[in-house]
Amino acid sequence: MYLLTNNANSNVIVAALLLILGLVLIIKGGDFFVDASVWIAEILHMPKFLIGATIVSLATTLPEMIVSIIAVVEGNFAISIGNAVGSVTANTGLILAISAIFVGGVIDRKEFGIKAMLIMLSGLILFGFCLTGKFGIFPSILLLLILIYYMYETAMSAKRASLANKETSNEQVEVKKDKKAVITNIIKFVLGVAGIVIGAQLLVDNSQIVAKAIGISDGLIAITVVAIGTSLPELITTITSIVKKQGELGVGNIIGANIIDLVLILPICSFISKGNLEVAKQCAYIDLPALLVISSVAVIPTLINKKFTKVQGIIILILYIAYIVLAYLGQQGKLFY
């Protein structure tokens, strides 16, 4: 690991500081990586709608993905799965709730309905197969098929919006290609990847140390500190959209991040584990049901009313707090961990 001192208290303090450093590196590295990825896509003359629908969406999910991959390689399935599932629950129960409470917003029922259906379908697939205690290759393939459909539908939706604004799918974006811009973006790309990888390693290793020191499980710290930490970019985007009175921007960002977290991260981890991704009872009987309940409250009333309401946001936030308390009490009673 990263700690060499023999003093237990010093170990915990240093581990906590390294954990925070890991989060900072992940967040800043993610920013650099997204900026550089978009620049590269523009240099290759990718249509603007395709950049937004694919490159940005996948790039912003990289921090969660790297954290889960490192965890599964190290054999810590609790953090690997807990990070992915916990990030989706945190995005919905905390970040989306905040957006609904302070801004709300009318939604496009057709566009939102497709994404809502994919979130619920993905959650049900995860829940059903995780009850067996393992998440194997077959459900992973199902989720990847959902990912392919989601990326296609998102690209087509963005293309329709682009054409409505009298832009063509072949629009070429003017982008700086001078030597300084090339060097700057190459450095951003390298630093971004390095920041995410190093930050993820620090986060995974030191979260385990902190968890053991304060007497909680890897699973609990995964759905709280790790999941919320890797969801900070979405939180920042949402707060920015609230300040700018553009609630729909935050909602779109959250929904997209949730789908990709569910249908991309866990299948990759399952393939790495050769179909032997072990699922703790805590995840199967508390985390995933909580995800489904919170997601249902987020999407069903929204589809009916065509908007997010303040009351809905408050209910979602209360459910999320109740879930965290239940997870903690379950761990204290040694029911699942």
Residue ranges and their predicted role:
Residues 1-337:
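Hydrophobic alpha-helical segments, chiefly the membrane-spanning helices
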